Amino acid sequence: MQVSVENTSALERRMTIAVPAERVENEVNKRLQQTAKRAKVAGFRPGKVPMSVIRQRFEADARQEAFGDLVQASFYEAIVEQKLNPAGAPAVEPKSFEKGKDLEFVAIFEVFPEFAVAGLESISVERLSAEVTDADLDNMLEVLRKQNVRFEAVERAAEKDDQVNIDFVGKIDGEAFAGGSAKGTQLVLGSGRMIPGFEDGLVGAKAGEERVVNVTFPEDYQNLDLAGKAAEFTITVNSVSAPQLPELNEEFFAQFGIKESTLEGFRAEVRKNMERELRQAIKTKVKNQVMDGLLAANPIEVPKALLENEVNRLRVQAVQQFGGNIKPEQLPAELFEEQAKRRVVLGLIVAEVVKQFELKPDEGKVREMIEEMASAYQEPEQVIAWYLKNDQQMNEVRSVVLEEQVVDTVLQKATVTDKSVSYEEAVKPAQAPAEAE
């Protein structure tokens, strides 16, 4: 078999393969012999059809099948021989497939980029440290109470944080506009749900009162037909309700699946959850900085095939997340290209770090991660047992652990600065999530 390879770009290869005619004819004859055993031809018993008849009737099909199998087999042999690592399926261009002659075809494909991870010493990471204080815990308990607030009707003027039930009609230049009217709307004053000025205009209003509130739609309002325009809303207040925060009692604790009957026990459980969230937030922020550093220090070209595959994956995820009757392929590719490129490049870099430093998942850390995740459930031992008997889930955990080991490896060479911050600052969402596939 003859093979020649042309580099048509940094990652694209044009490989010409010639398979000897003898091998081609052997493959064709093999298929004809198999066909002869089962072919049903009028006038002949099964298995007794002369080969000349078999060849006359079935040679074209046998040759086409042989072509497909030989292209696949010889392409694999060629990339092994040439030590190439394709990043996707090849585009095949037949050149010659005449009887008695060599089978010749061209395979065009991309290869994975070859590179060594560099610049680890140039990466700078700020590693946060924080603790959950009693004040943080008190704030969290208030948040939990507000999330479970109930509203009770009151006979007084509406205040901030009250809930009002309203009917309203909005007009622009004296004309009602689409989407500007509603009846029986529940609105918490100060929630920021309505455009600026709308909620403020209802503070002090009482049930049964009608108010006229003048507002201006923001310049960046999502409905461009309304953006920047002045509007007048006539609002009728049907009722005013004041927030009633639940008591910190056993009934309240049970809403969170916590069996503790005392406030001290509940606080301990909430603190444990906050500490788990804190550890994860700090770990995520460190990981993001490491991944950003790896990207900056290792600019590599991305195979188009990998990028297209990742874009398609993100399209499917978007449809699954947001629903609707849209098909994934209807979503514009450019919406996902930047994220897809980041994920693909990080995946390649992380894989290379694993290879360079000969990393393997630490089974002890795998067990620790499973126990950490299980601790968030009421029956952690059952969760641990479920993971241990589920190979797919175990492999997913191993992948996460291996990625953490990559981060640890980089941190050993990077410049790391420790910084003590508050709980709130530490758990504040990171600006750009790191993603490696």
Swiss-Prot record:
Keywords for this protein: Cell cycle, Cell division, Chaperone, Cytoplasm, Isomerase, Rotamase
Single GO MF annotation: protein folding chaperone
InterPro entries, per database record: PPIase_dom_sf, PPIase_FKBP_dom, Trig_fac, Trigger_fac_C, Trigger_fac_C_sf, Trigger_fac_ribosome-bd_bac, Trigger_fac_ribosome-bd_sf, Trigger_fact/SurA_dom_sf
Main location: cytoplasm
Gene Ontology terms: biological process: 'de novo' cotranslational protein folding; cell division; chaperone-mediated protein folding; protein transport; protein unfolding
Keyword flag Nucleotide-binding: no
E.C. number(s) listed in UniProt: 5.2.1.8
Keyword Chaperone set for record: yes
Coiled-coil parts of chain: none
GO terms under cellular component: cytoplasm
Compartment annotation: Cytoplasm
Any single Pfam family the record assigns to this protein: Trigger_N
UniProt signal peptide: none
TM helices/strands, residue ranges: none
Superkingdom classification of source: Bacteria
Family named by the database record: Belongs to the FKBP-type PPIase family. Tig subfamily.
Record comment regarding domains: Consists of 3 domains; the N-terminus binds the ribosome, the middle domain has PPIase activity, while the C-terminus has intrinsic chaperone activity on its own.
Function: Involved in protein export. Acts as a chaperone by maintaining the newly synthesized protein in an open conformation. Functions as a peptidyl-prolyl cis-trans isomerase.
Name of this protein: Trigger factor
Originating organism: Pseudomonas putida (strain W619)
Underlying gene: tig
